[in-house]
From Swiss-Prot:
Stated name of the protein: ATP-dependent helicase/nuclease subunit A
Binding site for ATP: A47, S48, A49, G50, S51, G52, K53, T54
UniProt signal peptide: none
Domain UvrD-like helicase ATP-binding: 26-488
Assigned EC number: 3.1.-.-, 5.6.2.4
A cellular component term, taken from the record's GO annotations: cytosol
Recorded catalytic activity of this chain's protein: Couples ATP hydrolysis with the unwinding of duplex DNA by translocating in the 3'-5' direction; ATP + H2O = ADP + phosphate + H(+)
Needed co-factor(s): Mg(2+)
General function of this protein: The heterodimer acts as both an ATP-dependent DNA helicase and an ATP-dependent, dual-direction single-stranded exonuclease. Recognizes the chi site generating a DNA molecule suitable for the initiation of homologous recombination. The AddA nuclease domain is required for chi fragment generation; this subunit has the helicase and 3' -> 5' nuclease activities.
Family designation: Belongs to the helicase family. AddA subfamily.
An example Gene Ontology biological process: double-strand break repair via homologous recombination
Source lineage: Bacteria, Bacillati, Bacillota, Bacilli, Lactobacillales
Subunit structure: Heterodimer of AddA and AddB/RexB.
Length: 1216
């Protein structure tokens, strides 16, 4: 097809006018049209939240295809795999529709080819592109195409540690070992080993991986801050800060004297206030830095007189207490800043004195890092295993050093498109530059939604182009998409009100002006006063907070407030739970949130990506078990195992065993004491009673058998042996959240198996890997389980990006920002390089022996201070963007939820606004989102803000006030008042009579088991008799049966029962890896993992199982593994017909496929049979029970049921 010319500016303008004058219900905006059709230059689309950027991107691609561009000529980068999939699906629909609409034969054929090529198009993440690229061109760098990705963090950590220790030993024993020893000691802290240094090395390495050339950055930028250090200018800056701080203090005190101080006319502190004002008043325009520093020193000294209470308003009058508290709080804030400035004077002096020494240390660090980076790179090349960043680095290296490859891609790509451009890092930016011809880039993003700095994303890449294109259109075209089609006017007005007053270039990195303000464009949503955004504050006093912290089970007031609003939406407005989202900045308080919601019976679905797998109790128990098997001399792990439900030793028993020390030993560990107790070889052997001795013997025997088994079997087999020997897997399944716990244990076995398949073998290395993951403060992802269909969504703000919900609650507004990065021993900056805290050894000059002659002083380098300030501004800017993302997720109504004392907050004072923004100090001193929102509410009271704040106290959060949806546990304890003992025997006898009457009336309910299995409830379904493996072929036909008089087989040969075959077959079907092609060889390998005897394995017909996957149902399962659930436990309430009491049914479903409006349930049976109808009749009731459980769980009525019959020579699939 011949290329059709792209539209000119005039043609685009005509198109915009025509769209504006059209009668369409939902019109494209002029900016959207411009973004879709503009061509011939670099284009940056700044697309605010809900402005339809995905629509614009898809329409632009479709327009190019319709003009004759091939889909293979477009490079389209998305932030996630999911986004790429969604874009491909959207394009598939649009191209198909265009084919149907057009009459142009050439266009039809062209678009048909594009549709066929769509699966192979360069649409995906940068990582997916670089993998394909390196697979094709890696030979240029001698990289084999069969490389693998180090996605397993634990494996990566093991490799990293091995390389670190190799490089460490080389430096520790090398020619520069003295200077290296100094570096080592600088990061040792209280420890005596290399862990402190190793932690900083890994941190720097992660940073280097985000640069386009790590070694180049190390050599050119790592020491830049030391090279350009200017202490004279720093002293001048500090003097300016001191001036400003003293003037702020003067303004505060004068305002206080002119207003509130009149209520405290004779208070003693006012004399000191006047004294300080006189000191500040002595300064003038001629005062130099020395004068300002002297006044600062005298002011700070005055504040410290009278044990620091010289300026404290100590009024005890109840009516004046709020005024006094507000003054004291602001005074503390002011003097905290003055104290910091005073400290900075001293620190700057030390920084200058030790600058050269710190520089030398940094050079040593630079050398070590360079050697480590190169050694680790070489090690990964030996393994032919790389991180994603390595793949990108090699891709850049090829594109830079092989012009013919670069030019071929530049000629191939008509346009280089990137979505979520604000989250691009420097590697990706360099790659995009190399793939582009310089004027064919299309970049879409929103700097206000850049929230991935922790992944080394740099919003300044976007911001630099935004500023450049805005000032000089010749550089590139800037298009602003501001119209929001997602949210109500109430949500948008509230968001604008917040960020117009909060975000600017100084704090926030951008000016939130008319270029960034959200514009309401969803004509389907009419204004509704009920949807006005609310800032809800749980009114807590100090005692209330203390009470809350006393017990984990007591619900926080903040969550009760949220639950009350959720129930109000659900019950009064008919809002479905799934329309409500709870957003948090982190998952640290998720346990409290989940507890509160469950107590009120509110279904909840989490984002499923908590990296706290190793913290789950059941996994911790198993890890301690493995530690003990590896080395029983570890007391902590041994006690954990003995106290666990697997063995159940209590504190009394452990105390008795801990006293079993041999008389001739000074110190013994617990395991040795257990051996002593077994041998009765201790002076305290009398403490070991018979029951304890038997319990101990059982424990020691089992532990010994596990240790022996571990020597000759895989980790996977060992873990399953532990589960089976002590029924631990079954035990955790009966606990609350049992399916998730079982999934965690199952995943532990799989992860152990994966570990041993990645060239690492043995229990010792597995435990070391886990300990290293924990030591590095990492964790593994938790295991996802099937969520409820209608449930409140609980997720982090990061996870919510790109999603939308009718009702959004932003929780924990009072949760402090995470500032761990600014407390590190090392802070890095792309501009300044390394900032480090230097440990100086200083002489004290002490003469007395009891005083130390030297002390160690931690001195942050000048670059460290500069980087710290840069990091603080970047962190606060990112927190603002995080709040923006959260607020713009709401479609109808937004709730911002926090807590605080109304009495204290109402009297809090803030500096006046400047240029319509909060004072920069107010913004930078905020500890959390709530501080910003409250300051805006107070400073801009007269502005009629589009959000209102409301305090909710304890009296409004009683059970009665909250609502009636709570579901009380049937085992809930009665109050002590109900259990009081009777005062008289007569009353006691009356109570006994009542109990007897009650027991008689409810005998059926008392005798009813509280938990039953499907086979136990045949009173409901008589045919339900789950007797897997029982032979029913020829049932009832004894005629003609040959009678045998052979002697029974009394040999010791292992006998195999049908039940054993059935159990093993089920486990095999559960273990089969459906992501790989199934062959007889792969099934044989999987069968080896099944926990059973070889005799049972020999009875399983693998050909038959392979044949099943060739059936219609088998093929459907293979094609829909993302919808497949296998071995799924379930529990369901049923009612006993006789007693009319509820009981729990528990069971395990062999498997089912879960679709949007349908479920396909299947169950394997290994029974022998003549006719399939025999098994259908037998198991019809059981499947009906499973059907009911699934229907109730997912609210889906359409359920197909199949029996997979494996009891004959050929497999049969029967629909029930």
């Amino acid at each position: 097809m011949k290329l059709i010319p792209f539209l000119s500016e005039e043609e685009i303008q005509k198109l915009q006018e025509a769209e504006a004058n059209s009668s369409k219900e939902q019109k494209k905006t002029a900016e959207q049209i411009e973004a879709i059709y503009t061509s011939g230059q670099n284009i940056l689309v700044s697309a605010s939240a809900g402005s339809g950027k995905t629509f614009v991107m898809a329409e632009r691609i479709l327009n190019q295809l319709a003009r004759g561009v091939e889909i293979s000529q477009l490079f389209i980068s998305t932030f996630t795999v999911k986004a790429a999939t969604e874009l491909k699906e959207r394009l598939e629909k649009k191209i198909s529709k265009k084919i149907q609409e057009t009459d142009d034969v050439d266009l039809k054929q062209h678009l048909g080819r594009q549709l066929a090529d769509l699966p192979n198009a360069a649409i995906g993440t940068m990582d997916s592109f670089t993998q394909k690229f390196l697979g094709k061109h890696g030979y240029l760098l001698d990289i084999a195409p069969n490389f693998r990705i180090l996605q397993n963090q634990s494996e990566q950590l093991l490799l990293e540690n091995e390389v670190f220790h190799e490089v460490f030993e080389a430096h520790y024993q090398g020619k520069q070992k003295e200077t290296f020893s100094h570096l080592l000691k600088n990061f040792a802290g209280r420890g005596k080993d290399e862990r402190g240094l190793r932690q900083q090395v890994y941190k720097i390495y992660d940073f280097l991986q985000s640069t386009s050339n790590p070694q180049k950055w190390l050599s050119e930028s790592f020491l830049k801050g030391f090279e350009k250090a200017d202490f004279t200018s720093e002293k001048e800056k500090l003097t300016e800060q001191i001036k400003q701080a003293l003037w702020d203090l003067e303004s505060f005190f004068r305002y206080h004297l002119d207003n509130d101080a009149k209520e405290f006319a004779k208070a003693a502190y006012l004399e000191n206030v006047q004294l300080i004002l006189d000191e500040i008043g002595s300064l003038n325009q001629e005062s130099d830095s020395q004068a300002y520093q002297a006044v600062l020193a005298r002011v700070v000294a005055i504040s410290k007189e009278k044990n620091g209470r010289a300026l404290t308003n100590a009024s005890r009058k109840a009516d004046l207490k709020p005024l006094a508290d507000a003054y004291n709080e602001e005074r503390k804030t002011q003097f905290a800043k003055l104290g910091q400035l005073s400290d900075q004077i001293t620190i700057l002096d030390y920084q200058e004195r030790y600058h050269q020494d710190t520089w030398e240390l940094a050079k040593t660090f630079q050398t070590f890092m360079s050697h480590f980076v190169e050694a680790y790179r070489q090690r990964k090349r030996q393994e032919n295993a790389f991180e994603f960043a390595d793949i990108s680095h090699y891709t850049i290296e090829i594109l830079e050093n092989f012009p013919q490859v670069r030019e071929s891609y530049q000629e191939r790509f008509h346009e280089v498109m990137v979505d979520e451009y604000q989250d691009t890092n420097h590697i990706q930016e360099r790659m995009l530059e190399l793939l582009s011809n310089g004027h064919n880039r299309f970049m879409v993003g929103d700097i206000k939604q850049s929230i991935y700095r922790f992944r080394q994303a740099d919003p300044q890449i976007f911001n630099e182009k935004f500023q450049r294109y805005a000032q000089n259109p010749q550089e590139g075209k800037l298009i602003l998409l501001k119209a929001n089609f997602r949210s109500s006017s109430e949500v948008l007005s509230a968001t604008n009100d917040v960020f117009e007053r909060l975000m600017d270039q100084e704090v926030g990195e951008i000016n939130y002006d008319n270029k960034h303000q959200l514009v309401f464009a969803n004509t389907k949503l009419t204004p509704n006063p009920d949807n006005k955004a609310e800032f809800l504050l749980y009114d807590k006093d100090d005692t209330g907070e203390e009470e809350e912290s006393q017990t984990e089970t007591k619900l926080t007031g903040e969550m009760r407030l949220v639950i009350k609003e959720i129930l109000k939406l659900h019950q009064e407005k008919g809002v479905a739970f799934k329309e409500i989202a709870l957003l948090t900045s982190s998952r640290s308080r998720n346990d409290q949130i989940l507890l509160a919601l469950s107590e009120y019976g509110i279904p909840v679905k989490t984002d499923g990506e908590q990296n706290n797998y190793l913290q789950s109790l059941e996994v911790q128990v198993m890890l301690d078990t493995l530690r003990v098997i590896h080395n029983p001399l570890q007391d902590y792990a041994l006690v954990a195992l003995m106290k666990s439900p697997m063995f159940g030793f209590d504190e009394d028993e452990l105390a008795r065993l801990s006293l079993q020390k041999a008389e001739d030993k000074v110190h013994e560990n617990l395991y040795e004491k257990l051996v002593n107790a077994q041998k009765m070889a201790s002076s305290q052997k009398g403490l070991i009673h018979t029951a304890l001795a038997e319990k101990l013997k059982q424990f020691m025997d089992i532990l010994a058998s596990w240790r022996l088994y571990a020597k000759t079997h895989s980790l996977y087999d060992l873990i399953w042996k532990i589960y089976n020997d002590r029924f631990y897997y079954d035990y955790v399944g009966a606990l609350p959240n049992g399916p998730a716990r079982q999934a965690n244990l199952y995943a532990l076995a799989l992860r152990a198996d994966q570990f041993e398949k990645s060239n690492f073998k043995g229990l010792s290395r597995f435990i070391r890997m886990i300990d290293q993951v924990l030591e590095a403060q990492h964790d593994l992802a938790s295991v996802a389980v099937a969520p409820p269909k209608d449930a409140v969504e609980l997720m982090t703000i990061h996870k919510s990006k790109g999603l939308e919900f009718p009702y959004v609650f932003i929780l924990n507004m009072d949760q402090d920002f995470n500032k761990q990065d600014s407390m590190s021993e090392v802070i890095l900056s792309r501009q300044n390089g390394l900032g480090v805290k230097y440990i100086a050894k200083m002489e004290t000059g002490a003469v007395e022996d009891h005083y130390p002659k030297t002390i160690k002083l931690s001195i942050p380098s000048l670059t460290y201070r500069q980087n710290e300030e840069e990091l603080q501004l970047a962190s606060y800017s990112e927190q603002m963007r995080l709040l923006y993302v959260a607020m713009t997720r709401a479609e109808k109504k937004l709730y911002l939820v926090g807590k605080g004392s109304r009495e204290k907050l109402e009297v809090k004072q803030y500096p006046a606004a400047k240029n319509g923004k909060l004072n920069s100090n107010t913004r930078l001193q905020a500890r959390n989102f709530q501080d910003w929102l409250w300051a805006i509410s107070k400073v801009f009271t007269k502005d009629k803000l589009n959000f209102s704040y409301r305090f909710i106290g304890e009296d409004q959060l009683t059970r009665e006030a909250i609502g009636e949806l709570e579901t009380k546990s049937p085992l809930q304890d009665s109050s002590q008042a109900d259990n009081r003992q009777s005062d008289t025997i007569k009353e006691a006898l009356e109570m006994l009579k009542e109990v007897e009457v009650y027991n008689t009336l409810h005998r059926a309910a008392i005798e009813l088991p509280s938990v039953q299995t499907p086979s136990q409830i045949k009173k409901f379904y008589e045919p339900v008799m789950d007797m897997e493996g029982v032979e029913i072929a020829g049932q009832g036909q004894s005629v003609g049966k040959k009678i045998s008089f052979d002697l029974p087989d009394f040999s010791t040969k292992e006998k195999v029962t049908g039940a054993e075959i059935g159990s093993a077959t089920h486990e095999l079907m559960q273990r089969i890896d459906l992501s790989q092609q199934l062959t007889l060889a792969s099934l044989t390998e999987t069968l080896k993992q099944v926990q059973t005897s070889q005799a049972v394995r020999d009875k399983i017909n693998l050909d038959k199982i392979l044949a099943f996957f060739d059936t219609v149902l088998g093929q459907e399962i293979l094609a829909n593994t993302d919808h497949l659930y296998r071995e799924q436990p379930f529990s369901m309430l049923k009612r006993d017909q006789k007693s009319q009491e509820d009981f729990v049914v528990r069971g395990i479903l062999d498997g089912y496929l879960l679709y949007e409006n349908k479920i396909v349930l299947f169950d394997y049976k290994t029974d022998r049979y003549d006719e399939p109808s025999q098994l259908v009749d037998r198991y019809r009731g059981q499947l009906a029970l499973y059907e009911e459980a699934l229907s109730r769980a997912y609210s889906i009525e359409n359920i197909e049921k199949y029996l997979i019959l494996l009891g004959k020579d050929e497999v049969q699939v029967v629909k029930v």
